[in-house]
Amino acid sequence: MTFIGIDKTIITILLFVVMIESTRAQTTDTIATRWRGYISLDQYSKPFWRADTIVDETIQPMRINGKINTNLLFKASAILSVKVANYSKEFIQGKDWELKDGQLKILPQSTIPFLDKEELVFKAFKPEFSMHGKVPGTHVLFTEKPYFSSLQIIVTYIKAKDEKWKGFVPAFANRNLPSSIAKLKSKQNLKVVFYGNSIEAGYNTSNFMNTPPYMPTWADLIIYKLRQHYGPQISFSNKAVAGKMASWGREQVNSVVIPEKADLVIIGFGMNDGSAHVPAETFRSDIDGIIRAIKKQNPKTEFILISPMLPNPDAIQSGIQSIYQSELNKLAEKGVVVADMTAVHAELLRHKLYQDMTGNNVNHPNDYLARWYAQIILGFL
């Protein structure tokens, strides 16, 4: 593999940091339940674009030019609660915050945590809190520890009536995923396999990080809701491995995925490919190779292809991720649909900060953005 424009040592580092915790794929068919007592998975899986009440939207309060920014996705008609993202504290209206012009405003005497913009990019290396920046000689704030969830806040609010989501919305795929939908509706056995990198493995979601509110990975959230709606006969296996690219997925598909005899495979490579500047045509060929290899053995298998979320533009991981969505669209056909998380994330970034939606400030989603992954994919099913 040739990495264009990036030092090989740095590439080794950036692929290593996403494998700090584990490189093992999930091998069990169970879903952790530690979230009970903190959150409702029914509320967490309700599509943001349909909900009147937005539950636990994440904000990273950010002081920019002396003003603390707190950007909600939608204007609010009422704010119901404001908490630390790790559920360690709830803040008081009139003391810590107020609603002004449809947005959350932090009051001067508030104890709500915040970051200064100047803390995001810096020159001096900070042990355990640094990643190479895209600009040579810089670093970006980064950690795989549950640091950001102690600084981010979650806001539950009632959306103003005229507020609408203007981004990508999935359509029920009864025509494009006919076999999977038919099995779900008739309550036949359905095997789902997840295949990808650290994002698909669930890195930086709160249960993965062993911190409240212990939200399951977005893959687990999908299975939870499918079982709730269609029945317990749905099985799954998560074969995602941190740090991997689509070329690895193609090389390993025969030994890793095909033996699972999946009815539906959800494929999510692209983040690491984009960091390594893998050409668009090569990326498409690798994904196509995965699909063809599986269909050769299991012709009725269907696929959901996920275009990658975007990396922090200040981090060295920021590459050509945004161009892969159009390549995946070229593979769409009956039995293959594309979940455009690239467009979803881009639309979110028109209204919110990158730090509102990240678990490591480089290339992993927090619970909030992970919920978008689950909701978008569930929208097809």
Predicted features and spans:
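Solvent-exposed loop/turn segments at secondary-structure junctions
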Residues: 198-202, 241-247, 271-276, 309-314, ...
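Charged helix-capping and loop-helix junction motifs
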Residues: 281-289, 320-325
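Extended beta-strand solenoid/passenger and fiber regions
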Residues: 26-167
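Catalytic His-Asp segment of secreted/periplasmic serine-dependent ester chemistry enzymes
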Residues: 308-381
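Serine-esterase "nucleophile elbow" of acetyl-processing enzymes
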Residues: 25, 163-239, 252-261
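Bacterial Sec-dependent N-terminal signal peptides
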Residues: 1-30
